[in-house]
Each structure stands twice: as structure tokens, then as C-alpha cells.
Amino acid sequence: TTPSGYKTNNKHYHRIDGDQISYDFGLQPYSGGIKSDGSHKYVHIADTEIFNTDNHGDWVSNVRDYTSNEEAAFIIHTGDICYENGLKAHIKLMNTANMNCPIFYCVGNHDLVKGKYGEELFESIYGPVFYSFDAGSVHYIVTPMAGGDYQPGYTKEDVYRWLKNDLAQIPQGKPIVVFNHDLLTYGDQFIFGINDQEQINLNDHNLKAWVYGHWHINYIKKQGNVYSVSTATLDKGGIDHSTSAFRVLHVDKKGDFTSELRYTYLDKSIQISTPAEGQVPVLASGAVLVTVNVY
């Protein structure tokens, strides 16, 4: 678990070697706009699927400029980087070093590709497919897609046992958010289990949100006390014809959040809002008040 207030330069993990008995992690201090009470903001993107597209500079710059100017704590990509070409290219577009902001990736169904096992290529570039990190007052958990285009090497049992151990290490009541490529459930109880006896009810661990992609739409739903949050693609727009955008989540000290979309491919745009045609209010001084929208 990467602790809050630090970043790793594209190395939040170490591959375990059976001959090595200790591992050192290089941590760099990083405030990321995290306030003293733990409140912060982060950026969510998904489904960029760049395996057969070019000219990504504009939307990548939009995200980089926003995270720098607004001091985002981190960027999370919830999967479908897409096939061998996308997996190899995306890390060059967006990584912790060139974004100057920690960026984390989930594995999606189209990121499980041909190899010894489905996530082999993903692991070689992006690291493990399940892990966690802290930012401010919240514990964030990254979990893998259950299956995809090729059979993964991990099983549901592997993820369950890791998740159970991860949750045992955090203070009781600490807010958690789970990132995955897809939604776990349509119901009010977010239960991850492998049989009738071995189950984790994430609601009991103060789950605030399940944040995902896969659907290619912008959609937020309250399921009991938990919000499910889906974000469409920032480079192509949504499957429902929604405008290209990335999501910003503003998290308070209790782990509760508000959300907004920031549109891509817009750069320093200014438009007159009022006066409208045929309506020109004049102040007592004789001046005309003009208001504008700036993006």
C-alpha cells in the first residue's frame, strides 16, 4: 500500500524473487493538494482503447494541465487500455513521471491478452493487477476484471484472500473506495465472496464508492449507502453520444464526495453569456454589464 503523501516513480510494486529476503521502496514526498483534514481530489478515466488510434496529445495534455493546476492527488485508469498495442503505448502517454502526478491502472477485459496467462503483458508494464494505496483519509483498492479475452492467471480465490488481508491492515471505520473495470453488483450489498462461508461485505468496511468503466457511459447511482460511478471515454466520447470528458471526484475528510466532468479538446475557450440578443440592460452609470463563460 503506497502511503498518503508520497508517490513512487512508476514503481509502486516490486516483483518478488525467491532469493531476496528484503525489499526497499523509494518514496518521493507528494502533497497532491491533500489538505490537513485528508480531503483531496482525483481524476478518473477509463476505456481509452488506443490500440488503433493516434493523435492523443490533446486529451493527455488536458488531463496533465488539470491535475497540475488543480493539484489532484492521483489519476486512476479503470481499464481497457486495450490489446497489445494499447498496453505498450499507453504507459508512454501517461505515467507518474510525465504526468507529474501518481497514476494507477486497473486491468480490463481487453487488457487480458495472449501470453502465458492473460495479465502477463499488463504485469510486465503496469505491475500487479490487485493492490491498494492511501490518499488523504481514504484507502483505495484496485481489483482486477474477473475475466476477459484470455484466461487470467489469478483466480477469484486469489483476489478474495488478498482483499481480506488488505482490509485487515487498515483501521476500522477508515473509508474505502474500490476501483474495478466493471460493476460488482446491481444491489445494495457489495459482497465479494468465493462461497457461502467465505464472503466480504464491503458495506461493513465503510465502502463509499465503487468506481468503474466498461460501460462507456457517464452514470452515477446510489445503491444503498454506496455510490457506483461509471465514466465514459475522454478521448472518443460515450457510447451514448456523451461528450468526451474525464471525471473529477472531490473527496472530503469523511470519504464522501462530489463529482464533476471536465471536457477534453477544449482549450482556453471564452464565450459571452449576457447580454443576450435584444436584451441589453444598462446600469445607472450608463455601462453595459457583460458576463462570460470561460473554460
Tell what function each PLM region has.
Residues L167-G187:
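Short acidic, glycine-rich surface-loop motifs adjacent to enzyme active sites
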Residues V226-Y295:
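Binuclear metal-dependent phosphoesterase catalytic core
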Residues Y42-H44, H77, Y105, V178, ...:
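Residue-level marker for buried hydrophobic side chains located in beta-strands
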